[in-house]
C-alpha cells in the first residue's frame, strides 16, 4: 500500500489543476468574451494578460502529465513555480485592498496564499521523490532496461 501513496497524491494534485482548468475553459467557451473576461480577472489580481494562455497551458498539459505520471520531476517543478507565483500574487493583492473592506476578505486572500504555498511545498517534495507506482516514467524506464 505504501508504494501507492505517491500515485494517489500525484493523481489528486494533478486533478486539482486539470479539473479547475476544465471549468475555466467551459466559462471561456460559453460566456461572451469569455477569454477577455478571464484575462481581466487575472489582471485585476496584478498578473499580466499574457499569464492567461500560460495558465491554461500549464494547468491543462501539465495536469494531464501529472495524472499520467509523465515527466514527474519536470512537471512538479513547473507546478511548484506556478503555485509560488499564485501564492505571491494573493499576498501582494492583499496590500491593494482598501482598509474599509471586511477583514474576512484579507483572511480569504491569506488562506488562498497559504494554500498555494502548501502546494508549492508538496510539489517540491514530489520533484525530490519522482519515482512513483503506475507512472509513464516507470513504464519508459522499464522498456529502456529491457533493450
Regions found by a protein language model. Name each.
Residues 1-33, 46-57, 61, 68-147:
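Extended, low-polarity transmembrane helix blocks
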Residues 40, 63-64:
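Generic signal for short, ordered secondary-structure residues
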Amino acid at each position: 500500500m505504501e508504494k501507492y501513496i505517491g500515485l494517489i497524491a500525484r493523481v489528486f494534485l494533478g486533478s486539482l489543476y486539470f479539473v479547475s482548468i476544465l471549468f475555466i475553459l467551459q466559462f471561456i467557451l460559453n460566456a461572451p468574451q469569455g477569454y477577455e473576461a478571464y484575462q481581466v480577472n487575472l489582471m485585476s489580481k496584478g498578473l499580466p494578460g499574457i499569464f492567461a494562455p500560460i495558465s491554461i497551458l500549464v494547468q491543462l498539459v501539465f495536469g494531464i502529465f501529472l495524472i499520467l505520471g509523465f515527466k514527474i520531476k519536470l512537471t512538479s517543478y513547473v507546478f511548484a513555480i506556478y503555485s509560488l507565483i499564485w501564492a505571491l500574487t494573493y499576498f501582494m493583492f492583499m496590500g491593494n485592498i482598501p482598509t474599509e473592506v471586511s477583514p474576512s476578505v484579507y483572511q480569504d486572500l491569506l488562506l488562498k496564499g497559504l494554500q498555494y504555498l502548501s502546494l508549492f511545498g508538496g510539489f517540491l517534495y514530489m520533484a525530490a521523490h519522482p519515482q512513483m507506482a503506475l507512472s509513464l516514467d516507470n513504464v519508459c524506464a522499464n522498456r529502456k532496461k529491457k533493450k
